Amino acid sequence: MKKTPFITLEKAKEIKAQIPTPFHVYDEAGIRANARALKAAFSWNKGFREYFAVKATPNPFILQILKEEGCGCDCASYTELLMAQAVGNTGHDVMFSSNVTPEKDMRKAYEMGAYINLDDSTHVEFLSRICDGKVPETVCLRYNPGGSFSLGNTIMDMPRDAKYGMTEDQMAGAINRLQKLGTKHFGIHAFLASNTTANGYYPELASQLFRLAVRLRNATGCHFAFINLSGGVGVDYRPEQPASNIALIGEGVRQKYEQILTPQGMDDIAIFTELGRFMLAPYGHLISTVLHQKHIYREYVGLDACAADLMRPAMYGAYHHITVLGKEDAILDHVYDVTGGLCENNDKFAIERSLPQIEIGDIVAIHDTGAHGYSMGYNYNGKLRSAEVLLKEDSSFQLIRRAEKPSDYFATFDFTDFHFGG
């Protein structure tokens, strides 16, 4: 299926006249429509809520849009908690997942009244100590089933190799201890596959977690308030990939819910999700201008963006589709490596990619950068992070994060006598 950018050459030029490339641009209309589609897919569950994974796109303007669409925030660090709080998310608007968590972070989550998702059974005492002997009324526990996680004959991931979560026996012990300390309600959380467009993933994960909830309820007598399916629902980065069908996924989870939980009298359990990539990736582009061309053993196109603006291709070998704006319908009769300017040979957005003829000054849109794009940026080689722009529903645009300046790069030397220009 052809991938079409949500921004035109004319609009990109209009933005570029005020905000130089490279910049990340986000599609407000697409974000809102997708959030509503997710909500509709799980409307059968009265307590359903999406907790957007802040790490995917940590920008308060994006979080505010999602808040308006009924989403909470999934946080995993002190600063992510501060950002969630800045847009008015407190209490059970926030899910905090522990993971080698510093005391400062855990205490902040507790003080905010967030749902706390414990990664390990030893964290029960850690939490109790931080809470001065108290514990929250509701606590979530992260599950790791071990072994491999499969759909049919296809192995999706290897939980046994993951650092996250606890065993079923450890969960039972943690529940018993927490009940003695005063916890009254529990949640279950698990993340067993990443970026899968297989529509059967969530239903299979749900089936495993629903059955686990029944076993743990029977073993401990506890009450489960929610089950958090976390993330993992992917997007179609490549044109030939199938897209996730969220309506079909939601229906699959509903069927498992009614087969497993309802007969057990556990049909008051809310379903939560923590989708980052699915919620935002398709609704972000990295917009960049062609600076140079090089003709040696391959044809190279050099952009003003680099891996510091989008790490995924360099780090994971990930595919991101590229559109030369204004040439959407041109013949793909040239083959290029599309590169950035870092002093690293893996700073390539595409390798031997078929594209239309490219000229210096062309503007390109690198697709699906709305999640894990800007957020994974860095300052290697002294590169400065790019701006973020919101393309609003009325086709106007708004700067939602300015580009870094040299003064930002040097800011942490403010205690010294060095003086930096720029």
Cite the ranges covered by each PLM segment.
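Active-site loop/helix belt of alpha/beta enzymes
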Residues: 145-291, 355
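Flexible loop/turn segments at secondary-structure boundaries
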Residues: 58-61, 82-83, 102, 148-149, ...
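A charged N-terminal "starter" segment
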Residues: 1-137, 176, 180, 184, ...
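Glycine-rich, aromatic-flanked loop segments that form ligand/cofactor-binding clefts
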Residues: 134-148
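Structured core elements
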Residues: 72, 95, 117, 140-142, ...
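Charged (often Lys/Glu-rich) extended helix/loop segments that serve as interaction or gating elements
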Residues: 266-422
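Short acidic, glycine/serine/threonine-rich loops at helix termini
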Residues: 63, 86, 106-110, 127-130, ...
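Conserved, mostly hydrophobic/aromatic
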Residues: 31, 55, 77, 109, ...
